[in-house]
């Protein structure tokens, strides 16, 4: 689903209270699970990491506990993680998620200072409650703090977040860090200019020396698997059926061969149309009117 209880100044998908998106979506739980099962049956592998994320705050999904529970029933799934801003976490919800089979929480903690946390979230951000929930969760599952380094805004806060994570580890909590580099997105909010990956990793190296910690987080379990075949490829002309409006202005979503195709600048409301596929990377398709 999309939708968010915050309004972060750096949001890559322009979610929250000031969002300019004209359409919201929520995907049925059964559909999500069934399609995920089909994909895993095709890949025919094990040790799968299922990461639950959406264009917004994941914990706003009304059936999040049930979704985790059903994914846990899939034998090939090992890790189940959720990305969250942490503000909706409670001890009860954490316990329910762990009981359902959640193994990891990725929490986008971007500042320790209350005033700066509010500024980045563009909404009141209860930093003390979020810190309390991080401590509680870290005793029950793995927590990865994934702050976004926003140059010129929260540079000094990264030091505080590192020390906060180290303090939890000293208390016996299971916490890791996965610091992210702010990237500009065409349809997102871009309060600053992004820095190069070279400069980003130089900054991480400097922080590693200061805090005596490894900050180059990597997912050791990554492995190759069969790629889902593409029913059509970039450059092809195909006939698609318009289903509904998309999230961008004048965007339509259409279907063909069991796939969704995004069509920008489309003013036709329904019916079949011919489009040229201009993007097929990662099985994400964009078509333009012929």
What do the predicted segments below correspond to?
Residues 1-31:
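Canonical Radical SAM [4Fe-4S] cluster-binding loop centered on the CxxxCxxC motif
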Residues 18-21, 114-120, 185-190:
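A short acidic, helix-capping loop that chelates divalent metal ions and anchors anionic groups
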Residues 34-55:
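Short Fe-S-cluster ligation motifs
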Residues 40-43, 98, 166-170:
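Non-catalytic positions within long, well-ordered alpha-helices that form the structural scaffold/packing
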Residues 46-49, 61-149, 155, 162:
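Radical SAM/AdoMet-radical enzyme domain recognition
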Residues 128-189, 199-219:
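Conserved C-terminal portion of the radical SAM core fold
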Residues 220-290:
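Terminal RNA-binding accessory module
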């Amino acid at each position: 689903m999309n939708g968010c209880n915050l309004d972060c100044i750096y949001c890559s998908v322009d979610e929250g209270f000031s969002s300019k998106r004209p359409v919201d979506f929520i995907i049925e739980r059964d559909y999500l699970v069934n399609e995920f099962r089909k994909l895993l049956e095709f890949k025919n592998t094990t040790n799968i990491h299922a990461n639950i994320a959406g264009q917004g705050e994941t914990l706003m999904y009304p059936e999040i506990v049930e979704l985790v529970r059903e994914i846990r029933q899939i034998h090939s799934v090992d890790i189940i993680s959720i990305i969250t801003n942490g503000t909706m976490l409670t001890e009860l919800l954490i316990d329910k998620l762990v009981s359902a089979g959640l193994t990891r929480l990725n929490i986008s903690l971007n500042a320790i200072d209350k005033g700066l946390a509010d500024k980045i979230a563009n909404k009141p951000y209860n930093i003390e409650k979020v810190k309390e929930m991080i401590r509680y969760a870290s005793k029950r599952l793995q927590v990865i703090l994934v702050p976004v380094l926003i140059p010129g805004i929260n540079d000094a806060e990264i030091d505080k977040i590192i020390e906060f994570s180290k303090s939890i580890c000293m208390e016996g909590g299971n916490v890791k860090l996965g610091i992210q580099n702010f990237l500009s997105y065409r349809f997102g909010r871009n309060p600053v200019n992004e820095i190069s990956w070279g400069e980003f990793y130089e900054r991480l190296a400097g922080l590693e020396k200061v805090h005596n910690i490894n900050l180059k987080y990597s997912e050791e379990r990554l492995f190759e698997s069969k790629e889902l075949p593409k029913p059509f490829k970039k450059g092809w002309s195909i006939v698609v059926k318009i289903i509904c409006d998309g999230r961008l202005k004048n965007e339509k979503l259409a279907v063909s061969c069991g796939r969704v195709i995004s069509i920008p600048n489309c003013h036709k409301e329904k019916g079949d149309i011919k489009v040229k596929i201009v993007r097929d990377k990662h099985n994400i398709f964009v078509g333009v009117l012929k």
